[in-house]
Amino acid sequence: CCVAILCCALSACSDKPATVKVSSFNIWLNTLGGKLPPSQTAKVIEASQTDIVGIQEGHIYEEDGIKHDHVPEIAESLGFHLFNQGEGHYILSRYPVVDSTASRYGVKIQVGKDKFCWMFNCHLYYIPYQPYQLNGIPYGDYPFIDTEEEAVWFANEARREEVTRYQKDIQQVMKGGYPVFLTGDFNEPSFLDWTQRAADAGIHKIKVEWPATKAFSEIGMNDSYRTIHPDEVSTPGYTWTPVPSEQEILDRLDFVLYSGCKVTDSFITGESEATSDVVVSPYPSDHRMVTSCFNF
């Protein structure tokens, strides 16, 4: 069953020889959150047949006096190159990394004899978390809110400075004419998802033009999943979360943004056929992985 879903989801990628597959994957406390071995996280990456992965929550965690740093072993098991961005962010690549920005936010990757792309990866700040604020779910010492204006204000307070730093680096490498990718757990939904149409359908409480995704859109970064699946009501593409609490607000927080190339497919890897295009069971993370396929 899993194999059949995999073949369907990957068919648009496999028949295009100039395709590069890019994924975003929050591995949940360096694989410790799901209480499964690191090899299960590697299986998720392997099942997607991806080429480049932005990893979030790869921090070294200590449990029972033992320090866990599983990302290097995952990269080695897959035969991938590894770039440590710091602060728990990693970029894994089937292709060699040949350069990086001074900030280490992004790397230049050689995907062919004369073909290069830039890959950025981020994990934007997690609190305050506006979907909880809007829905009366306690999370940190922050007030509940009711309006789009309040949601945008708190989102900017939490993430705007970091978004601006990434924008500057991305705009700089764009000048070279290369394809550019940005993966990440934004800890903030997309302005393409929380539309008035989605609010009218009861999917989200109100319309919100979320500022992080909007800011990247304004510099020419496109949302690959929403490009392939433009209907935010019929195909919400939830990546948060495979392990919902009773009060959970399901959402799409994990993104593969792109510029300078064409997206041909985008799919979700997760825990079940009901939620995902590619299934890995047991599933090791509290975020589903998103993978997109590109031609350049």
Residue ranges and their predicted role:
Residues 17-21, 48-52, 78-81, 113-117, ...:
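Loop/turn elements at helix/coil->beta-strand transitions in domains of secreted/extracellular proteins
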Residues 101-104, 108-111, 170-181, 187-296:
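Metal-dependent phosphoester-hydrolase catalytic domains
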